[in-house]
Amino acid sequence: MLILGVGYFLLGLILLYYGSDWFVLGSERIARHFNVSNFVIGATVMAIGTSLPEILTSAYASYMHAPGISIGNAIGSCICNIGLVLGLSAIISPIIVDKNLQKNILVYLLFVIFAAVIGIDGFSWIDGVVLLILFIIYLRWTVKNGSAEIEENNDKNNPSVVFSLVLLIIGLIGVLVGAELFVDGAKKIALALDISDKVIGFTLVAFGTSLPELMVSLAAAKRNLGGMVLGNVIGSNIADIGGALAVGSLFMHLPAENVQMAVLVIMSLLLYLFAKYSKIGRWQGILFLALYIIAIASLRMG
């Protein structure tokens, strides 16, 4: 099992690395072709694509009458996206935040606060429908109000949109399959080393559903595509709440997770306050990363 686990682990890592790079490259070229900003692509196409694991996991968990896993996966992934994904991305490449991005972050913050308020007593199917509708409205608003910052000489030399779309799809498949193999391989290694199921579930499964966002955002950060990173994080969080959590609540009532929601609100508020200064730099990234580690340690101790 150990050898098989190492093989899955390494193959998953390779697919994650190249898949995320192709996904970002295809997304960037499509953004230029359709004259939309990197943020819009990040908040829509990339966010929905990388949030598929969370949406499917939460929906299936609710269907199988495991509400704690359903809501924990959705909210935990949101915390991971800000603390780990955005934190590491900002450390690699500081993110410049213009007025338009600040407005998007404010909308995101209000969405999170609204979700926290209606979820004080848990999430019913009515709450799920409301969040799902707000998610759809957000997507339309983002696309409609997104303004691109395109250089004039980019259009002529770009490959065709079909090639870019194929690159995007292959990259997304690589990321999703790679994440599954990576986590499965890590589980096999852990079991072979007699690590408990509880530790495996708490660490690897929770981290695994956020791997697509992490790898895609790091690939974008290496290309200095800060808007795409921010769009992916914000869009993924809205998709996790308005998609994963909302769909999960349609199958059964989800319990309140006020501590996790409070952590998410605080981290989202810090994100907005940092963005007001027009830059999320390395020190902010280190702070987000530290807060994520503290939050995970506190939740585990609780």
From Swiss-Prot:
What are the disulfide bonds?
A: none
Classification from the root reads: Archaea, Methanobacteriati, Methanobacteriota, Methanomada group, Methanococci
One GO location term (cellular component):
plasma membrane
Species per Swiss-Prot/TrEMBL record = Methanocaldococcus jannaschii (strain ATCC 43067 / DSM 2661 / JAL-1 / JCM 10045 / NBRC 100440) (Methanococcus jannaschii)
Q: Where in the cell is it found?
A: Cell membrane
Q: Name one GO biological process term.
A: calcium ion transmembrane transport
Which family does the record claim for this protein?
Answer: Belongs to the Ca(2+):cation antiporter (CaCA) (TC 2.A.19) family.
Q: Membrane topology type, per the record?
A: Multi-pass membrane protein
According to the record, the segments passing through the membrane are 3-23, 39-59, 77-97, 106-126, 128-148, 163-183, 199-219, 227-247, 254-274
- What is this protein identified as? Uncharacterized membrane protein MJ0091
Enumerate the UniProt keywords alphabetically. Answer: Cell membrane, Membrane, Transmembrane, Transmembrane helix
